A protein has these predicted regions:
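Charged, glycine-rich intrinsically disordered N-terminal tails and low-complexity linkers that flank
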Residues: 1-73, 77
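Short, glycine/acidic-rich beta->alpha junctions
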Residues: 108-111, 152-158
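Short amphipathic alpha-helical face segments that pack within enzyme cores
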Residues: 69, 158-162
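Secondary-structure boundary elements
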Residues: 76-81, 118-125, 164-173, 181
Length: 224
């Protein structure tokens, strides 16, 4: 944590030599569409003033265990086969340590990590895949409130759209795996099988440059 100087109702810090990049997680926050974070929190992180320590829990653990299952869902249930590219395919094992959590080293301001890619027959990238786990019996609202009509929440869609934009593609596929805490999905994520038959998967496909913002009256929102 850096030294902070209080100036009445504002603060100032010594500029950092190397600010942290804005990731897809933080991008929706700075444009005001993430209800779970604030622009000030992102500012503190990027200036290296302060960052909330990451602590793994049953929710993050479940996501890590289920993610490879979603890769198989993409390959077999959705029929993409060997067109599915994972971070391990590109960077090998321990890809986070190898890349420092940034798959866009040549981009000065924005960065982050995509979950998976879909390539065409020519092996060129066609689509960015963003994977989410959705709790339906928690405090953060029902599945219907967050994935209305099967569409991803705006802040999550914007996160995935940034990664697509940085890769120069316009197609995004969001995959949400529905988990029930009361059912024990978070305690035993290894038993969760994402499939349409199990009715525990939502998918939303859209273009990164123009998509519908979920507000009363619904209007088209240009991201970039």
């Amino acid at each position: 944590m850096k030294d902070i100087k209080w100036n009445g109702s504002t603060i100032s810090v010594e500029p950092t030599k190397k600010p942290k990049k804005l990731t897809g997680t933080h991008f929706p926050t700075i444009v005001g569409v993430n209800p779970f974070s604030s622009p000030f929190e992102v500012w503190c992180r990027c200036t290296r003033t302060y960052e909330i320590p990451f602590e793994g829990n049953k929710y993050t653990n479940a996501g890590q265990i289920i993610e490879p299952k979603v890769f198989d869902f993409l390959r077999y249930s959705m029929g993409f086969g060997d067109r599915v590219i994972t971070p391990e395919d590109v960077y090998g094992k321990d890809h986070f340590k190898k890349t420092w959590g940034d798959f866009y080293p040549n981009t000065p301001i924005f960065g982050g990590m995509w979950d998976a890619l879909i390539v065409g027959d020519d092996r060129k990238i066609e689509c960015v895949v963003e994977i989410k786990t959705v709790q339906v019996d928690g405090r953060s609202g029902s599945l219907e409130e967050r994935w209305k009509d099967g569409e991803a929440p705006h802040y999550q869609a914007l996160q995935a759209s940034l990664y697509a934009y940085l890769l120069g593609v316009d197609k995004v596929l969001m995959v949400a795996v529905v988990l029930k805490d009361k059912k024990g999905d978070y305690e035993h994520p290894e038993q969760v099988i994402p499939s349409y038959a199990n009715e525990n998967v939502y998918t939303d496909e859209f273009k990164a440059t123009v998509y519908r913002r979920r507000t009363p009256g619904e209007w088209l929102f240009k991201c970039f």
